[in-house]
C-alpha cells in the first residue's frame, strides 16, 4: 500500500464471529451445527489484528462505491484487508446468489435452495469494476448443483464482461469444482481469466468431514486441468481446523504436483457458533515456516499469514507469479503488470 498522500492509520479487529457471519435464518440447524454450537466462540490471540492505513486510493474507491451504490464481498464480509486491497484498486465480487447448494463447515455462506440465476449479473459486475476503476477483480461464487451446468456460464460470462468493459483490468476467477467435468471447466479456460483458482482448503484426513460435497482428489484434478489448459493456477489452505504440520506440508506438495502455481495459507476464523470450532491458533512463526516450505516446493507465488485470504492482494501476487514463471504476458495486461511492479511490494497482513 502506498502511504503517501492523505492517510490515517487504524487498528482493525476481525468481527467476533469471523468475517461477516450470516444469520442462520429460518433453516433448522443440522445436528452437526447443534454440536458445534455447544462450543463457545474462541477468544482470538493478540496477533489476530489488522493494522490498516487509509490512503488516497482507498478513499477514491470508497467514494465511487457509495456514489454508485455498488456491492462487494470486501464490504459485506467486513474484511479487515479492505483498506489495503482497495488502496491497490482490487476488490472481490460474489456471484450466483446468496445460497449455496453445498455446506462446508468453515464457510460463512448459508446453505439452501438458491434463487433463479440472475442472467444480468455478469454485466453488472463488469459495470461495477469499471465504475470503481479497479485494475484487478477477483470473482467467486456459490456452488449451484441445482443447475445442469453448475452455473459455469455465469462464471465465464462474468470474466468476459469484465474484459469487455475494462480491457486493461485483470480477472481472477475462484470456482467451485463443477464436479470436475472437463466440458464445463473448458468454458472457464476459453474465457481466459488471468488466474484460475480452486481452493482445496484442507488436508485429506479431515477433508470429507469439513467439505463433504467435495473430494480432495477431484479438487486436485480441477487444478491439473487448469494447468494443462495453460492457466496460471491458484489454491488456498486454511489452518487451525485439526490438521497436523506434516499434513500441511504434504498438501502443499500435492498442490504443486497437481500444477498449482500460487498458494495462500491462512488461519481459520470461525464465522458463527454453528460452524466448526477452531482447533488451534497458528502462530506467526509457523506461517513463516510454511511460506518457506512452499517456496522450496516450487510455488511461483506464496502468501501466508493469519489474516491472509485467497483474494488478498491477488493482483500483486499474480504479477509476481507471472514474473517468476517468465511466461509471455498478453498485450492486454502488460501495462497493468508494469503498474503493479512499480508499486510498494510489501504485504501488510502476510508474514
Curated annotation (Swiss-Prot):
It is found in: Cytoplasm. Disulfide bonds: none annotated. [4Fe-4S] cluster 1 binds at residues 74, 79, 85, 311. It catalyses: [[Fe-S] cluster scaffold protein carrying a second [4Fe-4S](2+) cluster] + N(6)-octanoyl-L-lysyl-[protein] + 2 oxidized [2Fe-2S]-[ferredoxin] + 2 S-adenosyl-L-methionine + 4 H(+) = [[Fe-S] cluster scaffold protein] + N(6)-[(R)-dihydrolipoyl]-L-lysyl-[protein] + 4 Fe(3+) + 2 hydrogen sulfide + 2 5'-deoxyadenosine + 2 L-methionine + 2 reduced [2Fe-2S]-[ferredoxin]. Residues 86-300 form the Radical SAM core domain. Residues 1-27 are annotated as: Disordered. Its main location: cytoplasm. This is Lipoyl synthase. Its cofactor is [4Fe-4S] cluster. Gene3D superfamilies: Aldolase class I (3.20.20.70). Its EC number is 2.8.1.8. Transmembrane segments: none annotated. HAMAP family: Lipoyl_synth. The gene is lipA. [4Fe-4S] cluster 2 binds at residues 100, 104, 107. The keyword Acyltransferase does not apply. One of its GO terms (molecular function) is 4 iron, 4 sulfur cluster binding. Pathway: Protein modification; protein lipoylation via endogenous pathway; protein N(6)-(lipoyl)lysine from octanoyl-[acyl-carrier-protein]: step 2/2. It holds the Pfam family Radical_SAM. It comes from Tropheryma whipplei (strain Twist) (Whipple's bacillus). Binds 2 [4Fe-4S] clusters per subunit. One cluster is coordinated with 3 cysteines and an exchangeable S-adenosyl-L-methionine. Residues 1-10 have a biased composition (Polar residues).
Amino acid at each position: 500500500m502506498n502511504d503517501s498522500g492523505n492517510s490515517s492509520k487504524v487498528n482493525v479487529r476481525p468481527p467476533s464471529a469471523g468475517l461477516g457471519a450470516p444469520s442462520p435464518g429460518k433453516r433448522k440447524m443440522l445436528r452437526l451445527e447443534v454440536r458445534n454450537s455447544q462450543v463457545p466462540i474462541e477468544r482470538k490471540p493478540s496477533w489476530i489484528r489488522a493494522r490498516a492505513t487509509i490512503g488516497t486510493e482507498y478513499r477514491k474507491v470508497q467514494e465511487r462505491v457509495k456514489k454508485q451504490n455498488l456491492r462487494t464481498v470486501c464490504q459485506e464480509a467486513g474484511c479487515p484487508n479492505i483498506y489495503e486491497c482497495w488502496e491497490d484498486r482490487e476488490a472481490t465480487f460474489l456471484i450466483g446468489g446468496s445460497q449455496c447448494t453445498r455446506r462446508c463447515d468453515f464457510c460463512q455462506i448459508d446453505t439452501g435452495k438458491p434463487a433463479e440465476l440472475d442472467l444480468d449479473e455478469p454485466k453488472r459486475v463488469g459495470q461495477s469494476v469499471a465504475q470503481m476503476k479497479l485494475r484487478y477483480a477477483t470473482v467467486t461464487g456459490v456452488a449451484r448443483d441445482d443447475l445442469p451446468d453448475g452455473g459455469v456460464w455465469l462464471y465465464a460470462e462474468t470474466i468476459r464482461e469484465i474484459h469487455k468493459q475494462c480491457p486493461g483490468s485483470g480477472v481472477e476467477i475462484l470456482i467451485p469444482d463443477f464436479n470436475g467435468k472437463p466440458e464445463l471447466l473448458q468454458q472457464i479456460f476459453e474465457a481466459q481469466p488471468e488466474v484460475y483458482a480452486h481452493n482445496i482448503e484442507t488436508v485429506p484426513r479431515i477433508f470429507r468431514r469439513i467439505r463433504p460435497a467435495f473430494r480432495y482428489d477431484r479438487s486436485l484434478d480441477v487444478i491439473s486441468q487448469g494447468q494443462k489448459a495453460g492457466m496460471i493456477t491458484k489454491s488456498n489452505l486454511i489452518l487451525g481446523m485439526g490438521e497436523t504440520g506434516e499434513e500441511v506440508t504434504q498438501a502443499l506438495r500435492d498442490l504443486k504436483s497437481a500444477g498449482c502455481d500460487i498458494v495462500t495459507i491462512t488461519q481459520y476464523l470461525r464465522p458463527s457458533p454453528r460452524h466448526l470450532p477452531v482447533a488451534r491458533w497458528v502462530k506467526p512463526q509457523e506461517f513463516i515456516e510454511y511460506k518457506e516450505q512452499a517456496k522450496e516446493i516450487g510455488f511461483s507465488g506464496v502468501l501466508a499469514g493469519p489474516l491472509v485470504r485467497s483474494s488478498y492482494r491477488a493482483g500483486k501476487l499474480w504479477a509476481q507469479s507471472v514474473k517468476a514463471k517468465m511466461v509471455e504476458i498478453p498485450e492486454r495486461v502488460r501495462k497493468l503488470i508494469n503498474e503493479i511492479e512499480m508499486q510498494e511490494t510489501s504485504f501488510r497482513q502476510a508474514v
